[in-house]
């Protein structure tokens, strides 16, 4: 069962990305290093509710 999740930057709080994840195999919140346009560099993005 894939669900749509939003990724928010940990430094600015901006919600820059929307992706999908499989809740059965990844029940915990995902964390990815993605590009932040406001900071113009890669930062850690966490899944938000």
Curated annotation (Swiss-Prot):
Pfam families named in the record: Ribosomal_L33 (PF00471)
Keyword Ribosomal protein tagged: yes
Keywords in alphabetical order: Ribonucleoprotein, Ribosomal protein
Alphabetized SUPFAM superfamilies for the sequence: Zn-binding ribosomal proteins (SSF57829)
PROSITE patterns, sorted: RIBOSOMAL_L33
Family per similarity comment: Belongs to the bacterial ribosomal protein bL33 family.
Name of the protein in its database record: Large ribosomal subunit protein bL33B
Designated gene of the protein: rpmG2
